[in-house]
Design a protein with these regions (language model features):
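Catalytic core of pol beta-like nucleotidyltransferases
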Residues: 1-22, 31-36, 46-105
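Glycine-rich beta-strand-to-loop/alpha-helix junction loops that act as flexible
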Residues: 26-28
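Short beta-strand->loop micro-motif that forms the acidic, two-metal-ion catalytic signature
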Residues: 41-45
Length: 105
């Protein structure tokens, strides 16, 4: 499966709803070892004043489903939290060190 056009669609949908600072692709697609059962893992870093993450995820997922893009895991975090956690938390550090930046503001 060609992942690049799907990633572009995901990025467009996210940016429609979220003023992202960074959007990372992580997991098997970023690391080059996806399987047929792999989902697309996306990590979004937002400004600190970004609204309700649950509502934003619901809007993003709704738009993705209209584009027939279903297998996406979304994680959102605020920029100040990411700056602290990227050196301490295992997931955040892995995303920062090994993830692929697909958008940067």
């Amino acid at each position: 499966m060609k992942i690049e056009p799907i990633i572009e669609n995901i990025k467009e949908v996210i940016l429609k709803h979220v003023p992202a600072r960074y959007i990372f692709l992580f997991g098997s697609y970023a690391y080059g070892n996806p399987t047929e059962e792999s989902d697309i893992d996306i990590y979004i870093v937002t400004p600190d004043d970004t609204g309700n993450f649950s509502e934003l995820c619901a809007k993003i997922r709704g738009d993705l489903s209209k584009k027939k893009i279903f297998f996406v895991d979304l994680l959102l975090t605020r920029e100040s939290v990411f700056e602290v956690r990227k050196m301490k938390n295992v997931l955040d550090r892995t995303v920062y060190q090994k993830g692929k930046i697909i958008y940067e503001y």
